[in-house]
C-alpha cells in the first residue's frame, strides 16, 4: 500500500516505492487527506496514435495549455503553476478553484488546489478543484506509434 493505493512490482529485488519516491506519500496525503474515503467511480480507456514518450512529454509541460486547454487556464491560477522534479517523480502544483472559471462549477468546493504528480515511468496521480476527488492515469505503450491511456476516477460519495 502506498497512499491507500496498491502498486505492484514483479521484481523481488526492486526497492520499495516509498524508498524511491522520497516525500511523495507525504505530499499526496497533504493535498488529498480524504483519499482513503474516496470511491472508485469510473474507468476510461483511450487509444492514442502517438509514442507513449511523446504523450508523457506533452503532459509534463504546460506551455500548450493557454492554447489547447483554455478553460483549464481559467480554473487554475497559471501564474502560481509550478513544476518541481524529485528523483522518480515530479510535482505540478497551482492555486485553483476560481469561481469565475469557464471549466466547471466549483461552488462549495472542498478541494481548492490543483495537484498532480507524475511517477516515472508511466503513472500520473491527480487532484483537481471541486468535490473530493483523485485520478490515476496510466500510459501503456503498444508499439512505437500507439499508446493506451487508462484513467481511474475516485470521488467522495
Which residues are covered by each model-predicted region?
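C-terminal catalytic domain of Rieske-type non-heme iron oxygenases
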Residues: 4-157
Amino acid at each position: 500500500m502506498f497512499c491507500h493505493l496498491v502498486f505492484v512490482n514483479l521484481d523481488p529485488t526492486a526497492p520499495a516505492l516509498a524508498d524511491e519516491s522520497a516525500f511523495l506519500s507525504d505530499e499526496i496525503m497533504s493535498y488529498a487527506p480524504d483519499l482513503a474515503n474516496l470511491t472508485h467511480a469510473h474507468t476510461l480507456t483511450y487509444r492514442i496514435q502517438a509514442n507513449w514518450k511523446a504523450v508523457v512529454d506533452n503532459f509534463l509541460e504546460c506551455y500548450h495549455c493557454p492554447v489547447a486547454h483554455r478553460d483549464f487556464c481559467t480554473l487554475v491560477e497559471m501564474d502560481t503553476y509550478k513544476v518541481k522534479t524529485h528523483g522518480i517523480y515530479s510535482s505540478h502544483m497551482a492555486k485553483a478553484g476560481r469561481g469565475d472559471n469557464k471549466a466547471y462549477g466549483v461552488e462549495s468546493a472542498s478541494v481548492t488546489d490543483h495537484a498532480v504528480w507524475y511517477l516515472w515511468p508511466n503513472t500520473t496521480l491527480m487532484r483537481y478543484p471541486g468535490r473530493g476527488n483523485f485520478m490515476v492515469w496510466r500510459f501503456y505503450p503498444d508499439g512505437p506509434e500507439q499508446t493506451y491511456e487508462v484513467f481511474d476516477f475516485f470521488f467522495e460519495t
